[in-house]
Each structure stands twice: as C-alpha cells, then as structure tokens.
C-alpha cells in the first residue's frame, strides 16, 4: 500500500459531533454540495473529502482501493484531532467507511451508508461488468449507469451535468482501478457482528443497491442496523431528495448517546 495521504477536504460547521463524509464512484466531494446549505452545523462538524483520483486529489498516486481509502480517512481524522467520529459513505464510499470500521472500530460512533456497496462487494453479470469497466473511457457508459440507477426518471440535463462532473473530476485510470476494489473485494467477515449503530438509506428507484440487497447484507451483518427507503429517489439521494436525506441521516446521528455528553461538555464552564 502507498503512503497515506492527507485527503483534500472541506469542513462545515463547528458542532461537537464530528462526521466524515466520503463520496461515491461517479463523483468527487462535490456530490455532497446539494445538502450542505441545510445541515445542522451547530450540532455537527462535517469533513467532506476527496478520495485519491478525484477532485483535488485527482492526480494523487495510489492503489485506489477501499482499504487504502480507509487508511487515508483515518489519517485525516488524526490530522484533525478527531478521536471519535461518525461516518457517511455514498455508494463506493459506503464500502470505504465500512473498511474504516474494520480498521478502527473503537473510533466509530455511528455508520451511515447512502446506497452503500456491501462489504461483500457487488458481483456484476458479464454484460454489466463490461458497462461499468468501460465507463472509465466512455462517458456514455457513465450516463447509462446514472440513468438506470435513478429509474430512468431524471432529466437529460441533469444526466449530462453529472457525466461532465464525473469525467472532469476523476482520473480515468484511478476510476477504473477503484471498480476492481469496491465491486470485487469481500471483507464482510471483518465487520460482521459489529455493534456500531448502522443506518442504510436507499432509494426505491435504484435497482442495483436496493432495500432487498441491504436486507441480505447490511441488515444481517450489523445487529444495530436500521434501513430507510426513500420512495421517490434512486441512487443519488443528495441530488434527488436532499432534504429527506438530511432529516433521516441527522436524526440518526443525533440519537447517539455521546451527544448528551457533547452538549454537556460544550456548555461546561472552566
């Protein structure tokens, strides 16, 4: 594995509950832009990161694996001085945050997967594998993936914009290498049985990372798991239903028992 990297990131809020958010395969950290204006920034502080090969880390060398991504996330938490934190991961980022849990379970307060890739990977039939593998060099493949995973209901302008962002803010070689890791690696034995509270949020219009798949994986592996299906949403909840996503995720994070301690500590006088 290559040396850890301090991931490019932006901080939002100054709340006592620290949260690290990791993007998915088809976007950099700007994937979270639609939700940023309406987050509870008094209760939480969010670090939104770019993984290697994306955004400001587009030219960063690496193995482009979920394990390396997890090591990078932990290095960032160390740099920020965050001993305990919650994690949010979208799609591929859901696999990365589960890797963080596997590597440092004592540091994770709560785990959120937004249409998360299971820790068992996502085996694809040959024709789908060809579509996904070819997406590195063929923008039209990315468009088909975006359209299919949002139920074929999103406007052409949005699909075109998402493809442009994906191509402009990712390195093609890194993009292709990430696929082998998140789709092909199975590490679920390292997180199975973890007592961490774990929320999976899925969209009813997403045929790939569906509620059915999460019931067979996430809900079986995490004893303290919750599953929420957003009815008018596909794979990209941050774009499709941002306010619903914020409410579901922040209600879940706010239920953490340590939040009471955080509030008391913040209000304590020297």
Residue map of PLM features:
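Conserved alpha/beta-hydrolase catalytic His-Asp/Glu region
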Residues: 122-123, 138-193
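Catalytic active-site module of serine/aspartate enzymes centered on a nucleophile-bearing elbow/loop
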Residues: 224-270
